[in-house]
Amino acid sequence: MARSLKKNPFVAFHLLEKVEKLNIRKEKEIIVTWSRASTIIPTMVGHTIAVHNGKEHLPVFITDRMVGHKLGEFAPTLTFRGHARNDNRSRR
């Protein structure tokens, strides 16, 4: 279910502060965050944000096509290791 248009998109306050500070200084640094639920807004375009996936921070370069999506969409949390082998010989 989508967020109501009456409300603004959710962006963690500390993340918004860091992005605004870098925009004012016109610097590009990697911003480390645990806030996977934050929505990507146009002021974040061009920055690299390291999003936590539960184990490590994955760097995500923000482009204009990502605006409106959540940060967590670009940092997968699960790794598929393959299905279990069909090893019937070991069970007998």
Curated annotation (Swiss-Prot):
One of its GO terms (molecular function) is rRNA binding. SUPFAM superfamilies: Ribosomal protein S19 (SSF54570). It is found in: Plastid, Chloroplast. InterPro entries: Ribosomal_uS19, Ribosomal_uS19_bac-type, Ribosomal_uS19_CS, Ribosomal_uS19_SF. It comes from the Eukaryota. GO terms for cellular component: chloroplast; mitochondrial small ribosomal subunit. Protein S19 forms a complex with S13 that binds strongly to the 16S ribosomal RNA. This is Small ribosomal subunit protein uS19c. It comes from Ceratophyllum demersum. The gene is rps19.
